[in-house]
Amino acid sequence: MFNPMTPPQVNSYSEPCCLRPLHSQGVPSMGTEGLSGLPFCHQANFMSGSQGYGAARETSSCTEGSLFPPPPPPRSSVKLTKKRALSISPLSDASLDLQTVIRTSPSSLVAFINSRCTSPGGSYGHLSIGTMSPSLGFPPQMSHQKGTSPPYGVQPCVPHDSTRGSMMLHPQSRGPRATCQLKSELDMMVGKCPEDPLEGDMSSPNSTGTQDHLLGMLDGREDLEREEKPEPESVYETDCRWDGCSQEFDSQEQLVHHINSEHIHGERKEFVCHWGGCSRELRPFKAQYMLVVHMRRHTGEKPHKCTFEGCRKSYSRLENLKTHLRSHTGEKPYMCEQEGCSKAFSNASDRAKHQNRTHSNEKPYVCKLPGCTKRYTDPSSLRKHVKTVHGPDAHVTKRHRGDGPLPRAQPLSTVEPKREREGGSGREESRLTVPESAMPQQSPGAQSSCSSDHSPAGSAANTDSGVEMAGNAGGSTEDLSSLDEGPCVSATGLSTLRRLENLRLDQLHQLRPIGSRGLKLPSLTHAGAPVSRRLGPPVSLDRRSSSSSSMSSAYTVSRRSSLASPFPPGTPPENGASSLPGLTPAQHYMLRARYASARGSGTPPTAAHSLDRMGGLSVPPWRSRTEYPGYNPNAGVTRRASDPARAADHPAPARVQRFKSLGCVHTPPSVATGRNFDPHHPTSVYSPQPPSITENVAMDTRGLQEEPEVGTSVMGNGLNPYMDFSSTDTLGYGGPEGTAAEPYEARGPGSLPLGPGPPTNYGPGHCAQQVSYPDPTPENWGEFPSHAGVYPSNKAPGAAYSQCPRLEHYGQVQVKPEQGCPVGSDSTGLAPCLNAHPSEGSPGPQPLFSHHPQLPQPQYPQSGPYPQPPHGYLSTEPRLGLNFNPSSSHSTGQLKAQLVCNYVQSQQELLWEGRNRGGLPNQELPYQSPKFLGGSQVSQSPAKTPAAAAAAYGSGFAPASANHKSGSYPAPSPCHETFTVGVNRPSHRPAAPPRLLPPLSPCYGPLKVGDTNPSCGHPEVGRLGAGPALYPPPEGQVCNALDSLDLDNTQLDFVAILDEAQGLSPPLSHEQGDSSKNTPSPSGPPNMAVGNMSVLLGSLPGETQFLNSSA
């Protein structure tokens, strides 16, 4: 971007924009094209430190119309290649001290830069303006390009006006306005004359240690201006101008010898300079050496030369040479005296400037010229200001420097905008201040030469350049005018532009008041809404995006943990009601428990005291792993948990589901957090360890009185993305009345019961009352829907299937083998009513997930007493914890074998236990005949050894009774046996200590169904199989002794399970972290009765062994 003040191109010559690598170019040709036809380079080519100063392509300027004599013959331009590249870029870290890097280098480029000033005349010490550099053979204005280098190795060239001379690049502002400031330095714009002497100023005007903190991009500028600027040839004097002396000499050395011997030493009484036009105006010096040094200003003598190889620097004062030598050695003996500041400087004057600018902001050096109110921190900046702004004719004296009483500078925040610009008589109309848009903005505290707007480091504004910039509260734009002046335009246009620019700077300064020097950052706020408000739509929490980034990545890394805790990494809110008003205290506890487990602490918060007093809604169990199809971690299904209710693709065949067919095991509806009551176990829904029974017992006993309200979404407010599954929808079948899947309701991970556990989340149309069903006699068989797979009881119509259970026996689980296996499994692998006749030809509804192939229904002989089995036996939809892989490719024979194993085990274990403690009335238990399973003969005597039984079904059902803790068991009884519900375990786990099963005796009797609820209270109990309705066998049908059993109220005593079977099963594997039941497992070796039913008999040999042993 060009300087907006640059006038349009007026010449016809233009060079097409080109890209030329700089490192292969060297110095531009100075041939017949002249110095005016060279294209200028884009600013970006000068911003890299990798090429160093030497790689900078220096463009030439027009020497036509120069007011000064032509330069001496140029020295070899090979010197450019000797310059050492900087190891850093101006874009480097804001706190980097570029001067330190330069000075500490053994072959510092500063020495080479300083060697430019070898001309003896017209120099104010080290400063000279506008003269040709004798070291490089380029006009003096080109020397300012030495501090830049191309970063990209290319040089985009643009048309260049040959009449304006060299287009000089202003170092890019690193503020928001990163524009390329192009400037043209013309010799006619720069006044040249011998510099005014400052004999009393013992500070080092040539000091190279100055840091330009304010102008971060101008970091080598002060060195360049102080030591590198070539002195004009006019300063090289050979004629004596002493009053009354007009001798002429052939060399400068002769002139110097003449002055020292004839004029200085000849007048020993007073030390006064009588040089014609001397600005001291005959003011005497205090010592003779001061006069000698002063005369070097007139003669241009620089006797002190740098001794480093390749360095041609020379100085008129010894202290300046010493300071320069520190640039080679890297010595910085002058440490900042401010406490906490570790900056070091090579000379005391630089340290004083730093301390004034950075720490105290004192500006004792005030320009005393009429109409100028500029103030500076050091005399060198004042001298530079006077020369560049007021012209070479302006005299800088002690009075101008402010050597008298030093006025205290106003604080930075109270500095009034001083906007008087070049309007004085001594100011040249050609002087143009650098526009603020091209100025680097004040760094918010960085104390580095590479400061920028965006640098957050540091705590104070930086004005080490001594330049008070408009809008930046320090320095002056005039100080940079000799380096940054605009292109050559007419005097009238230049004045207009200058006035406009000054007016603009004034306005900006007024609109942008100077604040405190420290960096003020806004207080950090959480991205998005508060945590309690982020729990919005399901997808919003599932994916790790910027909108939900408040959750710790420690527990959002898992792709399966789409329901990672909504709490921030800190402690979850104890007062949940304030943050999540839509939740009950129990629900808040549940969230806190999930959060504690997700963090891996393993210690959820203790249950809130309000749980004991709370009524209201039940919370769905959070232990489900496969409450929606396609999410079955053990089945190899690759899906993201954040995709709700997505049916899974066809994975590899998984293990056959080992559902037990022992009836629906009813656990009382849990209170909001009843599933994890033990504070020593993980409570996250995706915790590697399932909950223990101990955690659940206490809350189960409480939860019997808290039943969910009809149609209530328990976890409202979008807390659970998967709470919107209805029981029918998760099962994939219609409702009991033949309706389609119900709309989503409060269902979450675990809303379906785990294994033989009850679902505590009920959708519309479900109640919490214990329901009963009419006697399934042949008269009313047709009353039940064809897809109902569970016997209804004799006290209610079949429409009550959607009701939820209400149990009366606290702490125990009721078992009804006639209702199939526990609910919570995915449709189907459960055998509803194991002793019933399916409706012949009744196909049953197909699963809603049409892309899951349905296994063909085996056709059984219809002549037998037990016709075709329900379709539910062959369904492949997975369900909670049962890990029956959808799209399973197991054959029908394997499924039959599975059913045989399940039912035989359940019936044998039912007979093993003693009478129920509750003394429930005896009722006969339906039994599934082997004929129903396709003719498979099941031994009615458990002749198989315990080892065989253990090998057949892994951990199997371990009978346990609360009344028999010593390991002895009573004789089998045909009714209401209390036993523990075994859960399938991985086949690789060691077999638990077996318990012999008693023999079974034949019995005769009709089927009678008790008053229990269907299938653990799940509204889909009975239609899990989605197959035809099952009916009891004809009256008088001779069947196994199990037919006479009435397990209507057979219950599971969790206390007995907890006491006896605590250490019978090994820990779950990580992949099977969630139990198939909603009964928690202990933190140690999980209870055999609480294992994962999803992986029992994962190997086919185990099934075969059991079938062979039971045949």
From Swiss-Prot:
Q: Where is the composition biased (Polar residues)?
A: 439-465
Main location class: cytoplasm
Q: Which InterPro entries match?
A: GLI-like, Znf-C2H2_ZIC1-5/GLI1-3-like, Znf_C2H2_sf, Znf_C2H2_type
Q: Where do the ZnF regions (C2H2-type) fall?
A: 238-263, 271-298, 304-328, 334-359, 365-390
Task: Sum up the protein's function in the record's words.
Answer: Acts as a transcriptional activator. Binds to the DNA consensus sequence 5'-GACCACCCA-3'. Regulates the transcription of specific genes during normal development. Plays a role in craniofacial development and digital development, as well as development of the central nervous system and gastrointestinal tract. Mediates SHH signaling. Plays a role in cell proliferation and differentiation via its role in SHH signaling.
Which family is annotated?
Belongs to the GLI C2H2-type zinc-finger protein family.
This chain belongs to the protein called: Zinc finger protein GLI1
Q: Which organism is it from?
A: Mus musculus (Mouse)
Q: Which taxonomic lineage is given here?
A: Eukaryota, Metazoa, Chordata, Craniata, Vertebrata
Gene behind this chain? Gli1
